[in-house]
Amino acid sequence: GYSSAASDVYKRQIETTLDRPGYNMYCPTAIIMPSNLRDSIWGKEDDACALENIFLAAHSYGVGSVWINQLQNICDTPAIRDILNDFGVPADHVVYGMAALGYPDPDTVIQPKERIGKVAYIE
């Protein structure tokens, strides 16, 4: 694992590179970061399938999850590549998405979805 100080440095670097002040990647307890070869024809789709299975598994254990895709276009930015190298992501890989995982706030009230019972067909 990485120290809290190292995690803070990584978060600040991502925030700065994205030019999104205050961006905290949803304050996850953990992040799962699949990657794939840059030249892989189905790399993005393979990563999406892996992430969806991670989300389903997390949900089955009561763990909240959210997709984070901000790294896919900045993987080759030197500061971000340094972070990816630290995590062991090969230089010829792209991170198309990440799973941020954590426990939902128990005080959050989830509003029921309104079911209107209609289907719209567009031809």
Label each residue range with its predicted role:
Residues 1-6, 10:
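Single conserved hydrophobic/aromatic residue that forms the stacking wall/gate
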Residues 8, 38-40, 105:
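Short, charged/polar surface micro-motifs in flexible loops or helix N-caps
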Residues 12-39:
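Helix-adjacent hinge/juxtasegments
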Residues 20-23, 55, 85-89:
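A generic local secondary-structure boundary/capping motif
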Residues 25-28, 60, 94:
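Short gly/pro-enriched beta-turn/loop segments at secondary-structure junctions
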Residues 32, 37-83:
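Small-aliphatic-rich amphipathic alpha-helix that forms the alpha element of a beta-alpha
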Residues 79-93:
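Short, structured secondary-structure boundary patches
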Residues 89-123:
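C-terminal helix-cap and adjacent tail motif
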